[in-house]
């Protein structure tokens, strides 16, 4: 069996933990609990006959002035960035975070989840923002940890990308 470590990265409160809980346990809670350090979950997925054990490292949300400990990224096969579509600043900080991560581990498969898609009335991102991601070659998937929309697609995409790298 293949094992792949995926790090969940983003600003605090974007829904990293909620996405992992929805994917691994089919659970969602409205209660916010800040992750301290790192929380590790596992889930096996079948990719067309290849079984992959995903080891999901849910890293504590980054504050504006904080750096993520580089040791957390050691052995990572992929990075799953999460931004909150209702909080513009999480999009604005993505590029800085991504640059820092790439400087630490190099160019590994990555994905940006545009999370909280269920809150469309509160969305603060537009087509120009989406195009900015595409222009940089960043793969994006809209997700909702609450409804589950796009969650499995996002995790299966990053799993496939790490296996086929």
Residue ranges of model-derived segments:
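TRAFAC-class small GTPase G-domain
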Residues: 1-165
């Amino acid at each position: 069996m293949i094992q792949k470590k995926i790090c969940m990265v983003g600003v605090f409160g974007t829904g990293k933990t909620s996405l992992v809980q929805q994917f691994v346990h089919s659970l969602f809670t409205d209660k916010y609990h800040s992750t301290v350090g790192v929380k590790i979950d596992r889930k096996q997925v079948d990719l067309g006959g290849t079984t992959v054990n995903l080891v999901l490292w849910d890293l504590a949300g980054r504050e504006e002035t904080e750096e993520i400990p580089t040791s957390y990224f050691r052995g990572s096969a992929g990075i799953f960035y999460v931004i909150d579509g209702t909080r513009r600043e999480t999009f604005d900080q993505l590029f800085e975070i991504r640059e820092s991560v790439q400087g630490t581990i190099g160019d590994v498969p990555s994905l940006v989840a545009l999370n909280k898609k269920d809150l469309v009335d509160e969305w603060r991102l537009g087509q120009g923002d989406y195009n900015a991601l595409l222009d940089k070659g960043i793969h994006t998937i809209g997700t909702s940890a609450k409804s589950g929309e796009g969650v499995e697609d996002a995790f299966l995409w990053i799993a496939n990308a790490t296996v086929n790298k």
